[in-house]
Amino acid sequence: MPAARGKSKSKAPVTFGDLAIYFSQEEWEWLSPNQKDLYEDVMLENYHNLVSVGLACRRPNIIALLEKGKAPWMVEPSRKRRGPELGSKDETKKLPPSQCNKSGPSICKKPDSSQQKVPTEKAKHNKNAVPRKNKKGHSGKKSLKCNSCGKTFFRSLSLKLHQGFHTGERSYECSTCGQVFRQILSLILHQRVHTQNKSYECDKCGDIFNKKLTLMIHRRSHNGKENFHHEKTSDSCPSLSPHHNNHAIDSIHQCRKCGKVFSRMSSLLLHKKIHNRKRIQKYSACGRGFKKKPVLVHKRICIGKKTHENKALIQSLRQRTYQSENPFTCRKCRKSFSRISALMLHQRAHTSGNPYKCDKCQKDFGRLSTLILHLRIHSGEKQFKCNKCEKVCNRLSSFIQHKKIHKRKKKLIECKECGKMFGGMKNLKVHLNIHSEEKPFKCNKCSKVFGRQSFLSEHQRIHTGEKPYQCEECGKAFSHRISLTRHKRIHSEDRPYECDLCGKAFSQSAHLAQHERIHTGEKPYACKICKKSFTQRISLILHERSHTGEKPYECNECGKAFSSGSDLIRHQRSHSSEKPYECSKCGKAYSRSSSLIRHQSIHSEEMS
């Protein structure tokens, strides 16, 4: 195995193929942006080093692609060769200006400011590769010791990376030689060294390299005077020293926009990114400036193309920022919507048609997602079966909700103050705090008192008719958020609570409990005045208003008051002439559903 020691020189020519590393498209996509930048810097620097010593005469295709900012995997990978490990200790390092021969002309310049302001992973490794003043590192003794495990190292960088194992920092260690790297790419490229012949060894620190030029570049970190450039460049300018000729040859890369000059193409490419950052686009709606891709992301926020759990909150914030428009209007009821999809879903309420039909059982559905779930029954796709009642659910969420029915074996406990039912004593005790606390907030219209201002504000929506929570599917509005949440279950058709007697399904356990009273005949809510009983608490409340004469729902147009909100809604249609209930056969419209039902009986008699 030949080894390059001392001042031994080899006449074997070095080509760009000896240093180039090629990636396939799949391998390139696995690299992170930092790893791609590191690969670009090393490849460009290796090429320009070969050009400076006269070892490269033709520009390879991969260099042309890298300088244009294109992906290098487009190059034909037929000449795959192994190269130096990226990010390791044998990277190319320029000679510091402080080591220049001051006897010659003053050509050395300070590093460009823009070159210093753009830190790269390569720069970090070069910084740690600066030779130490301690000469023990070259005498074969390991002078740096880890305080945690006692392991010794030649270099401070190796010690720092090793200590990352103790501190928990992300690092990658070679299983063969124990060398540690910050990036997985550096480790992969380094492991290629163990699979090849180790030919070139540094006589000062003992590092081994598989390429001669890599060793020559590495030697410059030990002694600035041993620069391999002088053999080729000393004749180009006899009045200058060999080292000064290096600056004259390398400093040829000039920025066309600002005129700055750089010694490496990689430094020029990094500098150009500063000018590219200034190219921003302003979004006309809010005036904020962005680059190409971020402006598209911000545009989605402005126009509302963003999913969020609390859509009502996002909608209210959007209305405060920009003027909201609802260009899509229903021709039958004149309701307007911001999206055409919401309008199409709303129009199904008038036509009562379900456009999605199953080809096997002819069952129709209002939404495509519901049809897809239904098709699982025919296809035999994975289903969830209950162990207790053998009910089969198509979705895991429905199966979890269904299991709660079997857990609800305890008898419901009723609150004596308001009549609400609870599944356990713990929930009842929490509820009783509402009745025991002080209620300083009083409603001016119905004199009802509340313990919190938020409860009073929600209650006053009954009198004002305000309904800020609107369903995006059908356009129906509600005064409380919880009412909107319950309503959305109608569209999802998720009804896990099924009656054991008639098979009717419900979306809430409370609705199932109310329905079961129809079969049992139970009427737990009795009027204290006339002893009349009801199956639902709301029916009792409406009945008691007939004794007290309370009418909390007042019309804003004529001032007429009503005991229930549904009566007020029906009354308001007399002012607006709204007739939402339309006959599908003759097109006649009515303001009440009961009137439509009576009218449809005429068509049924004609058919008979």
From Swiss-Prot:
Residues 124-143 have a biased composition (Basic residues). It holds the Pfam family KRAB. Keywords: DNA-binding, Metal-binding, Nucleus, Repeat, Transcription, Transcription regulation, Zinc, Zinc-finger. Residues 14-85 form the KRAB domain. GO terms for cellular component: nucleus. Residues 75-143 are annotated as: Disordered. One of its GO terms (molecular function) is DNA-binding transcription factor activity. It is found in: Nucleus. Residues 83-94 have a biased composition (Basic and acidic residues). InterPro entries: KRAB, KRAB_dom_sf, Krueppel_C2H2_ZnFinger, Znf_C2H2_sf, Znf_C2H2_type. A zinc finger (C2H2-type) spans 144-166, 172-194, 200-222, 253-275, 328-350, 356-378, 384-406, 413-435, 441-463, 469-491, 497-519, 525-547, 553-575, 581-603. It comes from the Eukaryota. GO terms for biological process: regulation of transcription by RNA polymerase II. Gene3D superfamilies: 6.10.140.140, Classic Zinc Finger. Belongs to the krueppel C2H2-type zinc-finger protein family. May be involved in transcriptional regulation. This is Zinc finger protein 667. It comes from Rattus norvegicus.
